[in-house]
Amino acid sequence: MNKTSVPSIDSIDRQWYLVDAENQTLGRLATEVASVLRGKNKASFTPHLDTGDFVIVVNADKIRVSGKKPQQKLYRRHSGRPGGMKVETFEHLQERLPERIVEKAIKGMLPHNALGRQLFRKLKVYKGTEHPHAAQQPKTLQLDPAASAQ
């Protein structure tokens, strides 16, 4: 009988990937990035370990959504105080904090536990093309071109 191999923490090789979000659909980009953060693109994927890679997303301010979502999609947050609910549309949040839109979409696709919080720390999102991670020599991650054309 074969035994399942569990990779040791030292044997996990973490890569850095660069994703350009310009003209990409939000949900399709988020699923691909969440999969890489989780490590599902590797043969050594283990559900209970962090085997994923680091991902840098640039041009978060140029992400797309379809239909009337720019005006109708709502983002809610609460201060914790009575009456502290704040509601903002996609359009308004994209002007103010475009990184938060991408972060929130990807975070929702990660596990909602301590492992998910650890995976989320490996995501870096920037609104322009500049990022401070050139020393890591990130590889460009090609997303499915058919997904962005829809």
Swiss-Prot record:
<dbReference type="InterPro" id="IPR005823">
    <property type="entry name" value="Ribosomal_uL13_bac-type"/>
</dbReference>
<keyword id="KW-0689">Ribosomal protein</keyword>
<dbReference type="GO" id="GO:0017148">
    <property type="term" value="P:negative regulation of translation"/>
</dbReference>
<dbReference type="GO" id="GO:0006412">
    <property type="term" value="P:translation"/>
</dbReference>
<dbReference type="GO" id="GO:0022625">
    <property type="term" value="C:cytosolic large ribosomal subunit"/>
</dbReference>
<keyword id="KW-0687">Ribonucleoprotein</keyword>
<comment type="similarity">
    <text>Belongs to the universal ribosomal protein uL13 family.</text>
</comment>
<protein>
    <recommendedName>
        <fullName>Large ribosomal subunit protein uL13</fullName>
    </recommendedName>
</protein>
<dbReference type="InterPro" id="IPR036899">
    <property type="entry name" value="Ribosomal_uL13_sf"/>
</dbReference>
<dbReference type="GO" id="GO:0003735">
    <property type="term" value="F:structural constituent of ribosome"/>
</dbReference>
<dbReference type="GO" id="GO:0003729">
    <property type="term" value="F:mRNA binding"/>
</dbReference>
<feature type="region of interest" description="Disordered">
    <location>
        <begin position="130"/>
        <end position="150"/>
    </location>
</feature>
<comment type="subunit">
    <text>Part of the 50S ribosomal subunit.</text>
</comment>
<dbReference type="InterPro" id="IPR005822">
    <property type="entry name" value="Ribosomal_uL13"/>
</dbReference>
<dbReference type="InterPro" id="IPR023563">
    <property type="entry name" value="Ribosomal_uL13_CS"/>
</dbReference>
<dbReference type="Pfam" id="PF00572">
    <property type="entry name" value="Ribosomal_L13"/>
</dbReference>
<comment type="function">
    <text>This protein is one of the early assembly proteins of the 50S ribosomal subunit, although it is not seen to bind rRNA by itself. It is important during the early stages of 50S assembly.</text>
</comment>
